[in-house]
Amino acid sequence: MALVLGSAALHPFRDLLIKGQSFPESAYLGVTGSWVIFAALQTVWLDQTLTLPIEVWPLVAGSALGLFIYYLCVMLTLKAGDLSIYYPIIRSSPLAIVAIGYVFLERYYSPLTLVGISLTLLGAIMIQYRRGAGLLQRPKLILTATAAMIGSAIYGLSDSVAMETISPAPFLFWVYTVLTLAFMAFFTLTRPAQRPLSQQLLGCWGSAPLHVLASGALSYASYVLILFAFQAGGEVAVVSAIRQVSIPFSVLLGALVLKEQRVLTRLAWSLLLASGVALIIAGA
């Protein structure tokens, strides 16, 4: 429990620190690349090996795919959206974990779980509601935030299985090496014609290098705590649900640091969303 709560306290700072970067592609590339370095240092510090068993490599691929979807959709969402509106949707991965279990594992859920799903969806919609602007004011951002949530569920499931046989640092080293290379290729191919490649991939380092490094360090520490929780026997959906205490925290950060508006209303709906996630797990 303490590991997950510690992770929840650290997690929102990653997106807060790189929100509003002039070159968000380079910022996210910088964060993922920093994880490779941190994982290598942790591996050396703990006197571990970077060699992985053959059976773990499909989980590396699954985790990297989920992370690619997650990071890309978070970047697209936060380019145009308030942190406190969309972060709660992005972090509602227990909803996707329960859905994947139902569709692919033939798991059936109690009425309590269905109530939790309803509360989660209501909270997610109402967080971004503005009176007079229409209920679904920015449906494209709802879509990218939801895709990020699904990506989070994919890598969470992959990582929880991997932690049954491997230590966090070597696993993260290879996952983030694959992810960083994938992002380098993707951002190179999608670079605007008028933007130099060096600016596309490294632009953030000239304007906010400390923000990128701090974001990488805090997010790495946050997720290593989650992997330790998986190693200790934590069930992925339960761990993800407890981590949802970061949702109201993100709303407060958005108001205090980014000066986002309507914080009390959004905080109320964020609490409803988090309550719905808790009910999903309680009834699963």
Where are these regions (language model features)?
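Membrane-embedded alpha-helical core segments of multi-pass
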Residues: 10, 14, 66-73, 93-100, ...
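Selected transmembrane alpha-helices and immediately adjacent juxtamembrane segments
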Residues: 140-170
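Structural signature of hydrophobic alpha-helical transmembrane segments
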Residues: 1-8, 51-67, 106-122, 169-181, ...
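Membrane-interface interhelical linkers
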Residues: 1-62, 71-81, 129-144, 177-232, ...
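Structural motif at transmembrane-helix junctions in multi-pass transporters
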Residues: 23-27, 73-89, 108, 164-170, ...
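MFS transmembrane alpha-helix packing/gate-lining sites
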Residues: 10, 66, 93, 151, ...
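Alpha-helical transmembrane segments of compact multi-pass small-molecule transporters, enriched
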Residues: 34-39, 89-103, 178-182, 222, ...
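Hydrophobic transmembrane alpha-helices of multi-pass small-molecule transport proteins
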Residues: 36-39, 98-102, 112-131, 265-284
